[in-house]
Amino acid sequence: MAGLPNSSNALQQWHHLFEAQGGQRTAEATQHLQQLLRLGLPTRKHEDWKYTPLDALLNGHFVADEGASLSAEQRDALALPLDAWRLVFIDGRYHPELSDDLAASGVEVSVDNQRQHLPDALHPEVFLHLTESLAQTVTRLRVPRNRRLDKPLLLMHITRGLAGDALNTAHCRHHLALESGAEATVVEHYLSFNEQPHFTGGRLTMTVADNAHLQHIKLAFENALSYHFAHNDLLLGRDASAFSSSFLLGGQVLRHHTSTRLGGENSNLRLNSLAMPVKNEVCDSRTWLDHQVGYCNSRQLHKTIVSDKGRAVFNGLINVAPHALKTDGQMTNNNLLLGRLAEVDTKPQLEIYADDVKCSHGATVGRIDEEQLFYLRSRGIEQQAAQQMILYAFAAELTEAIRSDALREQVLARIGQRLPGGTV
């Protein structure tokens, strides 16, 4: 793929950041860097990047600021009010002094640079290779066989923007393994320490073994000048289930991938997302799902609410492999445009190579229903309040699936900030 005219400068800077790691570089990270350099960076001419602007990002002066820390009071001021086992990462680096001791949790945790046994990427792309090459450590979380966690695991990622034109660059690499019969809830929380620009790269792989059950929630709550590029992989075994919800609620350019492989019969997947770009923000959500074996079930629901001059992008693919009989897969993308200049680009896709399957996809793009608005106004509800009621109801199908009341309230508060009349 051809690179942008200015991409060589960005690639050179990222190569320099990689070289600066010195002896910490691994063979696996080197391979990812080589893949990145071979691919180059995409242009608008490339179909997958047609609607995702990279020019401003690639003109940045990338640095990896080291040595930053926060006080416990600063951490708590940013933290979710959630009773959870918490691991804290600042600018991509693990800080044990700000994290909980997980000895009593039943979760085995290791933070090192050993990458030999990490799963291969399901659907690699350029920024996946970037994060794999620049993340300095790997955080491994293992939930043993038949263990059921009593509290969620919370991965708290705090990134600082820097004064001047330097773009602080933070990359996180995590791997979660649920062994057979295990159950866990994992929350990824991404936030900004201040209002300065920064660049976050995230990579989380999750293996859900036979008869294991995972609930995963991602909260992308970074500031309006941030860049966020992340790629999560899910691999499910026989009789396993996973329910993943991503709330993409902040960032100048935010692009999130979820790639999934259903590799064991009778596995079940629910994959949801909510994106709410405002002002000039761009939010790009992508899913890739491989029904590799038969007798599996998947349900996807992806919604966007686009305000002002914002742009939302959705691209989803369900692939049904040969012999994956009795596959049942559905994917829905619903979009609401609140501004005359708001835009959405949606592309749900099916690739079916097996017989006797039940698969469907669909997308809708519209505006607030005037009849609903008239009904609420006729009952004395003001225009803005009536709009907000309709929009909260539109998002409710996603927010009501959050089991934790405290977490749901935080998501609803963030949604409220991004609605017309909110504080964003």
Predicted feature descriptions by range:
Residues 117-381, 395-424:
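Conserved beta-strand/loop scaffold segments within soluble protein domains that form the structured core
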